[in-house]
Amino acid sequence: MSSDGIKEIDSDLIETNYDNVVYKFDDLNLKPNIVRGIFGYGYETPSAIQQRAILPITEGRDVLAQAQSGTGKTATFTISALQRIDENEKSTQALILAPTRELALQIKNVITSIGLYLNVTVHASIGGTSMQDDIEAFRSGVQVVVGTPGRVFDMIERRYFKTEKVKMFIMDEADEMLSSGFKEQIYNIFRLLPETTQVVLLSATMPQDVLEVTTKFMNNPVRILVKKDELTLEGIKQFYINVELEDYKFDCLCDLYDSISVTQAVIFCNTRSKVEFLTTKLKAENFTVSAIHADLPQAERDTIMKEFRSGSSRILIATDLLARGIDVQQVSLVINYDLPSNKENYIHRIGRGGRFGRKGVAINFVTERDVGMMREIEQFYSTQIEEMPADIGALFN
């Protein structure tokens, strides 16, 4: 494949050589238990890349997707891989490579969550972990392997990882991997896979290294180029309240609720213990509150989200688990009780309120220690977070 048509695109453009766009998860012909896992994970509607890439991947086509993090790309290949796995065949059927251990583990967790109701085994084969554990996992049989190139190649070469039944090879952040000195190992892995293996490649950019892979190892790929979703901060008014000290946050929250009338709000905290603390305190003040965090069983998360969507609970307190991929249409207010511990999550948290053109308000509680982080966030997103005006209530009338 030549590099024609592979180029940076305007933020509102999606460029592809594949015409089918599917706007609902229910219309993707997925196994019912995958759809259950998707909704449980927090997705309601597919993102731009999910609308376009899941179908060709589940059809077995080679796919080249240019997409950055924050577009829903991990769930795209996770859903597709789970759909293609034969649950009765215990051999490895899908191999996913990532440039770092952290990303590999993150992907494994997404697969485990979305595949919660399936009988699918997943294993992370990554450097820096026990070789023996790896060997045991391969001996006992794993259907999906997520790993870093060095360790995966090592396992294949030593014949612990048997590739005969692999039908999907997915490379996440391919540009990152190919520029980080993994090229030779990746090429060697390619050569040790069955010739019929489907190749799915995700990359934020399309340098020569990536295009070379598409030419050498991909068969007439579907190309999907999706720029990062820029609806993010548009239409969302961002404010901060200088609470000075952590201990003053709760009183500040109660004062805020006295001065505004809001249908529903999401409040973000950085830790599970803070979520639980705040939930208890607000319930004691007679607020109708739900809480959600990563340690809750999936069934419980499903119920909580259902209650919140139906409006029977007015405040949802959450950790960053919720910050990606959930569209709660009626939320007009997001409160960062804690500023996020990394800048990237800010947009996922507050983007919630303004999705699909809906206006929203985001209020950040800022202690003296948080001022630096808030300035970093402003710089990172080229945005301005203003001090909350005294007449904030007028925004909600």
UniProtKB/Swiss-Prot annotation:
Residues 235-396 form the Helicase C-terminal domain. Residues 54-224 form the Helicase ATP-binding domain. ATP binds at A67, Q68, S69, G70, T71, G72, K73, T74. One of its GO terms (molecular function) is translation initiation factor activity. Keywords: ATP-binding, Cytoplasm, Helicase, Hydrolase, Initiation factor, Nucleotide-binding, Protein biosynthesis, RNA-binding. It is found in: Cytoplasm. Its EC number is 3.6.4.13. It is an enzyme of class 3 (hydrolase). Its main location: cytoplasm. Belongs to the DEAD box helicase family. eIF4A subfamily. ATP-dependent RNA helicase which is a subunit of the eIF4F complex involved in cap recognition and is required for mRNA binding to ribosome. In the current model of translation initiation, eIF4A unwinds RNA secondary structures in the 5'-UTR of mRNAs which is necessary to allow efficient binding of the small ribosomal subunit, and subsequent scanning for the initiator codon. The Q motif is unique to and characteristic of the DEAD box family of RNA helicases and controls ATP binding and hydrolysis. This is ATP-dependent RNA helicase eIF4A. It comes from Scheffersomyces stipitis (strain ATCC 58785 / CBS 6054 / NBRC 10063 / NRRL Y-11545) (Yeast).
